[in-house]
Amino acid sequence: MFKKILIPLIDPSRALPYLQLATALLPEEGKVLALKVVLVPEHSSLSEGAEKAPEHRAEMDKIEFQFSDERIELKTLVRVAHGLSQGIAETVVNEGSDLLLLPWKGYTTSEDKLFGVTIDRLLERPPCRTLVVRASDFSGCRRFLLPVRGGPYAEFALELGSQLAKSLNADVTLLHCDAPSPEKHDNRPYLDFLQRLRFYPNLRRLLTVHGNPEQAIIDEAQRHDLVIVGAVARAEPDGFFLGPIVERVAREMQKPLVVVKTPDTMRAWREGLDRSKTLSERVDQWFAENTFQRNEFADLEKLLELKKKQQVTISLGLPALNEDETIGEIIRTVKNALLDDLPLLDEIVVIDSASTDDTVKIARDLGVPVYVHQEILPEHGSNRGKGEALWKSLHVLKGDIILWIDTDIKNIHPGFVYGLLGPLLREPEIRYVKGFYRRPIKVGEELYAGGGGRVTELTARPFLNLFFPELSGIIQPLAGEYGGRREVLERVPFFTGYGVETGLLIDLYNRYGLGAIAQVDLEERIHRNQSLPALSQMSFAIIQVFMERLQERNRIDLLEEVNRSMKLVKGRGNSYALEVKNIRDQERPPMLTIPEYRAKRQSRAMPAGAAV
């Protein structure tokens, strides 16, 4: 009946009875979504929620210790919102939940509220089929009472009670409240369902009450362990209406209670959410929910457990060109921690771009395979640039998840790798992860805290804010540490040079949406800083990528007239000269379109002993 149940939690330590109920309602391979909403003051940016999000994610992770049913998948979520009911409703829509289970503490401090502000507001217009649940333990519930009147929620209550009774091996008493009502309902679906339910083995008693049923329900409830009751609907613009029967049962009876209500149409609810949220709010919300810290994933055993559960393989590619000063320490640090001591990675591979120093020798001496990118897929030619090396690395790397980090890092730490990997293992919806960090700049022998990332701040971020504002929350779009799922990386083109990071970010966003992208704070990165003339050339190439993508979206039509060469100013003694340099990234097609790649992937997918 249900496939995905969302449970918002105020106190995750008390999640067990609600997890038990959700498990009893789900089929095998169903999914429970446990949600914690981080509240941000109404007039503050949602991005402020990023400060508390890691703490709440750690708190939610502890729920796994309360959950032991291997048939059901448990996923924990932390989301930010200006209001609790808003955050819950948005998550229902975004996650495609088909049942919302609202835990209720059993009382409210507001006399004019039945369940409390948040639940009452959600029940006014439920975003999907909804339960309000009061219980400390469902394991001992063996006798259910279902009072029904044939109203619009009767069939839902009957279906729910039937499924729950079947899972818990409980008996059901159906109490038909045949009270006269000024409102006319078509009871034929209810009566048809009632006839079918007579033959259900868990139905033990069928009672009919005439007149006012309130006291009959209260009296009968004393002989049962659980009461499941449907809300009553009526048109009332100022609020929702559960009806006096439900209100009295909720207030006077301390038995475990489930109140059910069905929604307005999903289309109407979704349209209301879309109208109420601005672009800036969507970006702020993404920033808070999809920005992680590497120390959230420092428990490597837990990452390994997630890897095994998902049955994925993981590759680390190290693009290199004359990096003999740093590549040895990078390989030793990562290999010892993430391959030798604990097999989180399945392979580490160096993708060299024809280095003339000892880069290749150092890597091979440390037992790491080295491929020269000019020799990969030679029938497709070769271009200069890091993007070319990354594109070709897709052909030689074997993993389902592919990570890349630069090889000029001087303060390498395993967290540069497991930080990128964590969100991909933790959140199935995340498909691409970017790193960000503090970037000190070295001037002479002095190391300054500021500086670094100059092309990012002067070129990439201004262009993103102007033309792709949905990506304006990406802190360092040009960072060289990133990774993703093969299934998405093989479906997008790669620019061959400086534009590779920009192109990937825009193309993955256009294809999969902002929610598929995450970023991770990798703390501090010390590396070799480039000269201003080199950064100028980098900016020139990156701007061309922006223009390529803008033209494809019909925002501008200038590319055919754009000059692809750049005049570089060179000092010569007391004078200057101009040097012309052609700076243009080539664009490699999606790797999935390359026949040799497809053949190689298909051969790996064949079972052992299969004919080729």
Predicted region positions:
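A conserved acidic beta->alpha catalytic loop
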Residues: 352-360
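N-proximal low-complexity "stem/linker" segments adjacent to membrane-targeting elements
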Residues: 273-336
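Small/aliphatic-rich secondary-structure junction motif
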Residues: 1-53, 64-77, 142-207, 226, ...
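Cell-envelope/extracellular polymer assembly enzymes that use nucleotide-activated donors
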Residues: 313-315, 347, 508
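Short aromatic/hydrophobic "clamp" motif used to bind/position activated sugar donors
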Residues: 402
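Terminal low-complexity segments of carbohydrate-biosynthetic enzymes
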Residues: 279, 526, 530-612
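Gly/Ser-rich helix-loop-strand patches that form or flank binding pockets
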Residues: 4, 19-24, 90-140, 221-273
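Acceptor/aglycone-binding surface of glycosyltransferases and processive sugar-polymer synthases
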Residues: 378-386, 412-486
